[in-house]
Amino acid sequence: MVQYLKKIKLRPLERDDLTFIHQLDNNASVMRYWFEEPYEAFVELTDLYDKHIHDQSERRFIIEYSSYKVGLVELVEINYIHRRAEFQIIIDPNYQGKGYAVSATKLAINYAFSILNLYKLYLVVDESNEKAIHIYLKLGFIIEGRLIHEFFSNGKYRDVIRMCVFQNNFNNKY
């Protein structure tokens, strides 16, 4: 797999990684942008792992930098007929602002388009998450639209922006 930042790599999520994922899941500032309830019990996480380990409509990767776990990338809702999937990423707050999100996103997009032969990746991002939107635009994502009051988080409904990138556009850029 192509590496865009030295020593950054994606590898499949393993059972041994669940403690790291559990720490991210229990960080309210991280989960706010995933529009999910924080404070998931570890047993719930292991049950989800067991349920989805052989699910061909999902791929989950640990982002590593020099053998340190710095985040998680997910390709979910993979549809092999329409050749599309939803992209999701979490960077551990201790590693944010160091370029890992850009590099990991490039690696994940490359995997989706070169290995899975998908045509389109899409995502939804909180409209207030300007850093993420900037990264996605930089990598060739385009804005498809705005979803009004799409998620309830921290006591209020949040608007999100739906963005996508197409295989040919990404391949032409990189």
From Swiss-Prot:
What GO biological process, any one, is recorded here?
A: polyamine catabolic process
Q: Which EC numbers characterise this protein's activity in its record?
A: 2.3.1.57
Residue intervals of the N-acetyltransferase domain: 8-159
Q: Which residues bind spermidine?
A: E36, E44
* Chief location bin: cytoplasm
User: Which NCBIfam families does the record match to this protein?
Assistant: PRK15130.1
Q: How does it assemble?
A: Homododecamer.
Any idea what this protein is called?
Answer: Spermidine N(1)-acetyltransferase
